[in-house]
Each structure stands twice: as C-alpha cells, then as structure tokens.
C-alpha cells in the first residue's frame, strides 16, 4: 500500500534547511566529533539509582498520555467498528478521565542490519497515519498511539534515523528517495560510498579517519565502533555536515516534536561486557539509551546516568572537577553504531579459502590484537558509573571499578528483540509489538529464539524481579508456524499470576515473505532503490497480514490485544469478536518439540572466538537467503551476490584478555579504516 511519489525539490530543500537549523541547536560544543567541556552546576550528580523512571521521563509521559489518548481512541474506534458492541470497553477506557485506564503501547524492533532497518520501517509505516494508505488499509494511528519505541542494532538504526531527523516518516523518506542526499541511500555500500568514484570514497574515509583520530588526540579511547558509527551516520543524516559529525543523541530532548510528546519515547539497547572477559549470556548487563539517560535496570548496575554528560570524569556521579562537565560524547552515530555483532559475523568470513593469502594473514594478526585490546567493542571512557554504590551486593563490582565501560550490540546475549526496557514494571506497559527480523535459521528467518531467551532470563540471577509471558521452544515456534505469522503471547493475565508481576501482552511480528524475499543477509551493505522499496513494502504486509487479505479482521484483533490487559484489570466485558481473535492468534500452550531437519536448524550468532582461526577453518558454511518467489531479473541479479550468510559455530570465548587497553594508536585509526574497507571488499560485503 506504500506508493512512491514524484520527488519534490522544494519540499526536499525546506527539509534540508529545517534539519540544518535543528542541528545547529543540537551540536557538540566543539562542533565536531570531539567532546568538549561545558559548565554545569557545582552540586550536580549525574547518576541516580534505578528505582523508578526518571523525573524527566515521568513529566514527558504526562504529555504523551494526552496525545496517545486521542490517537488511540480513534484507532480503537476504527478497529472495532464491525464489532457487535465495543461501547462499554471504550467508554471505560476513555471517558472516565483516568489516564491509568489508558493502555500503554510499546514497539520493539530487532537487530539484523539493513534487513531489520528496512523491514522494520515497513512495519512502522503500516502503523503510521502519515503513510499513504495506512489509515484506510493498514494500522495507521497505532504509531501515534505508541508510548515507547525501542531498537537494537539495525532496529536502532531505524529508530535513531526517524527520531534524530525530527521524527520524520518512512513515507517522507520514500518520497525523497530519488533526491540527492536522501536518507537511506544504500545504492552504494557504506564502505565504498562513491561507487566507481574512488576519489569520493577516499575522501569519505579520510573524513571518518580524521574525525576519530581527533577524538583520540583529545585523549579519549577509541575503537572500531567509532569508525563504524561514523560510516553509518552518513546514510542516516545525509543533509547534515559530514553525516551529523557533531549531532548528539541527547539532542532529541531539545526537539520540539519530542518536547511536545508528538513522537514515541526512543530507546536504544546495548549489552555490557565485564572487563577482562569476552563472553555474553543471559546474565549480561543490558543497557538502554534514552533521550535523558543511559544505564541499566539490572541488579549488576541498577543505575542511570545523564546521557548528555557522558564523557565526564566522575566518582559516584559527581564530576571530579566541580562545575565542569563534558558534552558531545553521546554522538548520535556512535550510539547508533555501538555494535560489534556485525563486525564479528563478517570477520569470521576471513577463513574463506577464496581470499588472497596476504589478506588472510594480515586480518588474522589484526583481529588477534583487536580481541585482546577490546577494539571490537564500543568504549565509554571515562566510565559514567565509576564508584557508584547502587548495584546489588551479590554482584561483582567489576563494572563500577573499571575506568571504562565496554558495550556491545544489544543482541549479543541472543535477546535480539529489545523488549527488556519495555517489560520493566516501572514503565507499566500493557502491550509490546515485537518486530523480529533476526536471522536465526539457515535461510535467515527468525525462529523465536529472542523471545525464548528473554523468557528464560527471568529465571536467572540477572533477571530477578522481571516478568515475561510464557513462550514455547524454538522447535515449536517453527513446527507450528508461529515464526511465519503474528502470534499473541500472554493473552490471559489469570495464567500469569505465578510470575513476579503481570507482564505486557506480546504481539509477535516475525519477518516473513509476502511480496519480497526479505531474508537478506546482514552483510548485504547495499540495496538498490527498488530493493529498498520492496523490503519496506514487505514489512508493511507483515504488519497488516498482507494488506488484510490473509485476515480482513486482523485490525480488530490488534485492537482486542491492545485493550486486553486493561479489560481484565477493570473487569470489563469483552466484545465476543475478541474471543474469536484470541482463539485464532493467542498461543494456547500447544507444543511440538520435534527436532528440525538439518536444512532448517538454527544458526545462533554467539560471540566469536577470533583467536581460534585454525580450529574454526572449515566450520564456516555458505548459506543462502533463497526464495521461491519470483523477483524481477534486476532485483534478483543485484541481490544474489549478497545473499550468503556465514555460520557462527565457534564456541564462546571465556578466556580473559591479556591486555585491557582499548586505545587505538594514532596510525592505527587510519589503518583500522583501511583494514575494514579491504576486508569488506574481499569478503563480498560491498
């Protein structure tokens, strides 16, 4: 239902000017990638205990509730228009003047590189009133009714792009796709942005290298994540100077569209890694970045810091130099690029026998140093949580004792759909739309692993105090086809009373093929305009059950899911149509644990042991994101070379690093960029 419109030069020009003026008020104090010193109150404390949401978030929610109340009433009225009687439930939710009766909606978009960014964009477009056709033929208005929007890795590229471009719409991105400096111009890889113009590519990488080197020369630790984030940003903020070189994540709080609560509350998710280790599991500390704070609800930290002043040298939240703070460290590209999963997955490919031997030798030597020096992760130094006292006494103080904080992609703990910030009891979310674009299986489709791991986390030490509804094992997900269509989990709160608290109902929206083979490789770093539009269109169809052709009543069922928690809490009679919906979409506890055949088995992307190259040679497999659907010849030919997905079968690396330093030398900044470029070119990722 998404239709491309003719490019409009005047609109594009006005948009570019507005972005420039907006960014001018949100720039780093140094007007560059380098953080700078700013004044702050002498008595300021930048860290708080995670006992509740922040005062800033609470004040923002009061505004947002007024906005979502109007939008949600309109959406539910349309969704239940064909119901026999929905007046009682709607009257109770909206006419009592009690905001606590208002269902609180959240959307979480998984990681998965550009595959997830584009497919997730289609899902959000289907929920957005601003999308052509979404109000009449989609779930238009649902996004306007949403309070929280979280993303991990590729999902965060989507969330960050929309939020930091003044809450632009996917429709607007589509309308301007043929213009110069258009958002998400993926025609050429971020590695070779000039295409055949090698001078443009060289200039881009020179700018990136200079930016990272300038940060390093200012005595800040840098890593490949800095280079990666800078490279990515040019596709997210093309109208801004050098891809928003000074644009900060905290600038979202200064945008009028956010201040007026006219957009959801954006959240980026990352995983912490204990100094001296390389293992990520369910006990990893999960961090979130929102417009006001970054930190973790987990008992291993239990703290939040003011995201605007990251980079400030503190002890227990107090700046070591009173009255002076650091700003600009929270560079938008850096936070959106706080990811190493894509690096780790692509780096495994260097064992491929088709690479020149000198490249293989060089890469192995380089990657060994990377792993030991932590250059494969994002380094937040100085540590904003240095010497904090809020963590649970049962946990090691490794995080708060360290001078640096080390973060990796939020999906490296196998919880690729970033729901953890949304299931916190303090946020009181009623329903989560979980958009899963993971490549869990051989053909790069999801198998529910992320939800399974989140469910399991509540029973390990780190998950104490959290709740998540019951979900089946991954074999059941696949055998019952739950990974190919929308499924509701946790439909009946009466069956969840043995959990810590009643968790949100989860509407699972897995990536599936409707009009396009959207199971593209995470290593596919370029998409033609036609492919981008097709990926987004397919995402629209995922959210709408193929434009409601698979189920004309699906919008009504979404409405039933939204009101379910409040309906049960308030003891309101459900419309009979909702009972039919729940029978059709709620998982009823049925299991089918029959093992999957080898051709379908899972390919879980665990942390890679880059020091064991010899033992892992031969383990890599070339896997194909194949499709039975016929595509146009141009689409097929342009994507076939990028459809290989590597197998991540290496064991978890538990050996401690011998060197905890994380500072790239002056010469290695440019060398790192060159290595990244060379490896990606030879591995076919470009």
Curated annotation (Swiss-Prot):
It comes from Saccharomyces cerevisiae (strain ATCC 204508 / S288c) (Baker's yeast). One of its GO terms (molecular function) is phospholipase A2 activity. CDD domains: cPLA2_Fungal_PLB. Residues 39-592 form the PLA2c domain. The keyword Nucleotidyltransferase does not apply. Keywords: Cell membrane, Glycoprotein, GPI-anchor, Hydrolase, Lipid degradation, Lipid metabolism, Lipoprotein, Membrane, Signal. One of its GO terms (biological process) is phosphatidylserine catabolic process. It is found in: Cell membrane. A lipid is attached at residue 659 (GPI-anchor amidated asparagine). This is Lysophospholipase 3. Pfam families: PLA2_B. The lineage of its organism: Eukaryota, Fungi, Dikarya, Ascomycota, Saccharomycotina. It is a lipid-anchor; GPI-anchor. One of its GO terms (cellular component) is plasma membrane. It is an enzyme of class 3 (hydrolase). Its EC number is 3.1.1.5. Glycans are attached at residues 56, 82, 129, 166, 221, 283, 313, 351, 495, 519, 547, 571, 588, 614. The keyword Membrane applies. Belongs to the lysophospholipase family. Residues 660-686 form a propeptide. PANTHER family: CYTOSOLIC PHOSPHOLIPASE A2, LYSOPHOSPHOLIPASE 1-RELATED.
């Amino acid at each position: 239902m998404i239709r491309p419109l003719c490019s409009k030069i005047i609109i594009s020009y006005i948009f570019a000017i507005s972005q420039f003026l907006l960014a001018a008020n949100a720039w780093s104090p140094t007007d560059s990638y380098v953080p700078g010193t700013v004044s702050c109150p002498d008595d300021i404390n930048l860290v708080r205990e995670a006992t509740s949401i922040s005062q800033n978030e609470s004040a923002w929610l009061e505004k947002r509730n007024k906005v979502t109340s109007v939008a949600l009433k309109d959406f539910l009225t349309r969704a239940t228009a064909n119901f026999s009687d929905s007046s009682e439930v709607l009257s109770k939710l909206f006419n009592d003047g009690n905001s606590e009766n208002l269902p609180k909606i959240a959307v979480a978009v998984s990681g998965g590189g550009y595959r997830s960014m584009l497919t997730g964009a289609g899902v959000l477009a289907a929920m957005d009133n601003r999308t052509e056709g979404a109000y009449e033929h989609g779930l238009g208005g649902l996004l306007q009714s949403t309070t929280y929007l979280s993303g991990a890795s590729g999902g965060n590229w989507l969330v960050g792009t929309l939020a930091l471009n003044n809450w632009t719409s996917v429709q607007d991105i589509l309308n301007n796709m043929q213009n110069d400096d258009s958002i998400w111009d993926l025609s050429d890889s971020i590695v070779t942005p000039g295409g055949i113009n090698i001078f443009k590519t060289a200039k881009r990488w020179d700018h990136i290298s200079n930016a990272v080197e300038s940060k390093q020369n200012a005595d800040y630790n840098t890593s490949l994540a800095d280079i990666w984030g800078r490279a990515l940003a040019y596709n997210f903020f093309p109208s801004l100077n050098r891809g928003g070189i000074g644009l900060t994540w905290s600038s979202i709080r200064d945008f009028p569209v956010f201040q007026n609560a006219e957009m959801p509350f954006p959240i980026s998710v990352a995983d912490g890694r204990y100094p001296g280790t390389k293992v990520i599991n369910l006990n990893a500390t999960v961090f979130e970045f929102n417009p006001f704070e970054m930190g973790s609800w987990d008992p291993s930290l239990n703290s939040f810091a003011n995201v605007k002043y990251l980079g400030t040298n503190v002890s227990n939240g107090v700046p070591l130099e009173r009255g002076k703070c650091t700003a600009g460290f929270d560079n938008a590209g850096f936070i959106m690029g706080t990811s190493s999963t894509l690096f780790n997955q692509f780096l495994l490919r260097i064992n491929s026998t088709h690479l020149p031997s000198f490249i293989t030798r060089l890469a192995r030597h380089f990657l060994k140093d990377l792993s030991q020096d932590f250059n494969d992760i994002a380094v937040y130094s100085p540590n904003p949580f240095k010497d904090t006292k809020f963590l649970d006494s049962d946990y090691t103080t490794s995080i708060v004792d360290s001078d640096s904080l080390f973060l990796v992609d939020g999906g490296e703990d196998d919880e690729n759909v970033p729901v953890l910030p949304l299931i916190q009891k303090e946020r009181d979310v009623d329903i989560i739309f979980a958009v899963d674009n993971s490549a869990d299986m051989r053909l790069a489709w999801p198998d529910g692993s992320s939800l399974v791991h989140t469910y399991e986390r509540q029973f390990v030490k780190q998950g104490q105090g959290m709740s998540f509804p019951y979900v089946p094992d991954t074999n059941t997900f696949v055998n019952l086809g739950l990974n190919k269509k929308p499924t509701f989990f946790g439909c009946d709160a009466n069956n969840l009373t043995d959990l810590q608290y009643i968790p949100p109902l989860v509407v699972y929206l897995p990536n599936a093929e409707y009009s396009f083979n959207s199971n593209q490789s995470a290593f596919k770093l370029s998409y033609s305009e036609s492919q981008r539009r097709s990926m987004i269109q397919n995402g629209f169809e995922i959210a709408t059950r193929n434009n409601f052709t698979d189920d004309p009543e699906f919008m009504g069922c979404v409405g039933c899911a939204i009101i379910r928690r409040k309906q049960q809490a308030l003891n309101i009679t459900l419309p009979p149509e909702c009972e039919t919906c729940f029978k059709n979409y709620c998982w009823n506890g049925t299991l089918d644990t029959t093992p999957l055949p080898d051709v379908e088995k899972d390919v879980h992307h665990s942390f890679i042991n880059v020091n064991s190259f010899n033992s892992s040679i031969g383990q890599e497999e070339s896997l194909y994101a194949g499709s039975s659907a016929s595509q146009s010849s141009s689409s097929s030919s342009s994507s076939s070379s990028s459809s290989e997905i590597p197998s991540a079968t290496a064991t978890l690396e538990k050996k401690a690093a011998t060197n905890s330093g994380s500072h790239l030398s002056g010469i290695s900044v440019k060398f790192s960029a060159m290595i990244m470029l060379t490896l990606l070119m030879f591995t076919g990722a470009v």
